[in-house]
Amino acid sequence: DDEFAEAFKNVVLEHNGMTVTCDTGYFNKKENWISMKGNPKCLLENHELSGDSIFLRLTPDGKGLKSALVIQNAHGIQKEPRKKRKPGTHTEAFGDTLYAEFDGKKLSRLYVNLNAHGFFFEDDLPEYKNLMEGARLDLSFKNGKMERATISGSAQSTYFYVKKNRTVAGKNVALGDTIHIDFAPEKNQVKQLKVQGGKNPSSGRYINLENKESVKDSTKKGNPL
């Protein structure tokens, strides 16, 4: 049947710029989905997904990736290359379950559930990793850049503020039940940070790394932009 294919042992599938490897794979051409088990990995331009099992939903024309569901030991990587004077970015997320949506070849949304944590950094400052940790992560992207993040359930976050001359001025540190962060994607900077309390005490502060004695509350506003 040309509409359905299955393969076993050292499976490698190449499809419109996407490479899939696994031990067991199923490809339903009619319904536009791919299911993988056994060390599955999905590689596409600037993105990599891995976990215990992966389910891919293709676009209606079958040429692109619409969404991906990774179940157990989920790991997602996104790398945006440098553009003109703007450095490239590296984002990683981990958790029990990961769901990703794509717009063309760009990641538009990333949702991680249970034991969720992640980080991202700019390629010229790899030692300054911006951290996220909680029960759940819900990240949205614009043109490949992170635009909004919601961290829920014993949420923690750390984000560095980088000046125009590419020196690190300070960092935001936040704790709470839920943390909402809005970014300025074109600047790779935190625009606003809000912390909600509940079962866990909430706090948000900005630490000036140029003057380590200077610490101020940042619960409502993330960076001194």
Give each language-model segment a name.
Residues D1-L225:
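Mature-chain termini and adjacent capping regions
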